[in-house]
Amino acid sequence: MAKKVVGQIKLQIPAGKATPAPPVGPALGQHGVNIMGFCKEFNAKTADQAGMIIPVIISVYQDRSYTFITKTPPAAILIKKAAGIDKASGEPHTKKVATISKAKVKEIAELKMPDLNASSVESAMSMIAGTARSMGVVVED
């Protein structure tokens, strides 16, 4: 018989830097999960992606065991890294903060492809370009 899922927790944690401190500790603690065990596993799995924020979905089962799935970093973080900026524009329609090339957008789209509900790289590119526009980043040909 399959184990019964009693909770799903979605977090965004810096790669390789999960600690029992908030937000990780309280989110896992209320479901009775072994917090240190999760932190060690997550840090080991994401050690090669240092500096990125990794979304993770943790499924907690009735016997307090858990499984987790890591996703690709959010598009906004990848765009900021590609453009070399710390912060997106507060007024994206009037203030443009950076420009990125179409090649960079394609690179990000290919990286994000497993997590996007896009059928082709072109449609994924338009999603990434839309995110860039809403951040005040210009996409040039």
Curated annotation (Swiss-Prot):
Post-translational modification remark: One or more lysine residues are methylated.
Coiled coil: none
Record Pfam families: Ribosomal_L11, Ribosomal_L11_N
Entry's Gene Ontology BP terms: translation
CC annotations in GO: cytosolic large ribosomal subunit
Cystine residue pairs: none
Keywords annotated in UniProt: Methylation, Ribonucleoprotein, Ribosomal protein, RNA-binding, rRNA-binding
One annotated GO molecular function: large ribosomal subunit rRNA binding
Function: Forms part of the ribosomal stalk which helps the ribosome interact with GTP-bound translation factors.
Protein family membership: Belongs to the universal ribosomal protein uL11 family.
Subunit comment: Part of the ribosomal stalk of the 50S ribosomal subunit. Interacts with L10 and the large rRNA to form the base of the stalk. L10 forms an elongated spine to which L12 dimers bind in a sequential fashion forming a multimeric L10(L12)X complex.
Name of the molecule in the record: Large ribosomal subunit protein uL11
Phylogenetic classification of the source organism: Bacteria, Bacillati, Bacillota, Clostridia, Peptostreptococcales
